[in-house]
Amino acid sequence: MVAGSGTFNLESKLDYMNAGDASINGTTIDRPPLTFFNPNDLDSNPAASALAKVAAINAKSKDTGVTAVVNTNVMTGSAMSVSPSPHSGFVVVNGFKIPLSTLSNNAQGSRAAVVAAINAPKAFESTGVVAIDSGNDAAGVILQAKDGRNIQIVFQRDAGSADDAAFAAVTGLKQG
């Protein structure tokens, strides 16, 4: 690790870095590369992710003497409840729509189904997110992005299914 000094302008909202928002050892850090600006993925805001900020900082590492690393992004799950009837719908993870179905009166089985759906090869390739069964109804399904990208979850329920809070409770996922 290299010692240095710098400044960061931080706001309460999650926004991408602009040129001049950060300075390290007297060197202005530019905005993240354009590859992080995806107009089709407004939900997860990849340009504001830790991954994008690290790329911007590391682009100037020869000038600053500093390299940045990103930590795994972890999104905790939600407490689960069981339902006498199965629920179905979709979870949109980082802009990618994944079909989900839960089981009747079986939180453990529902967690396993959610984990399998999110970890399916096509879903993982599209989202970069891994689902982990916490093994605990109180903790639900944990999501991780090892490369530090943002994790954004949105529910789309089938007609007649429960509201978002009830759907979250039977899937073990947290919307946000």
Can you say where each PLM-predicted feature lies in the sequence?
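Extended, beta-strand-rich, solvent-exposed assembly scaffolds of outer structural proteins
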Residues: 13-176
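Small-polar (Ser/Thr/Gly)-enriched, low-hydrophobicity segments
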Residues: 1-12
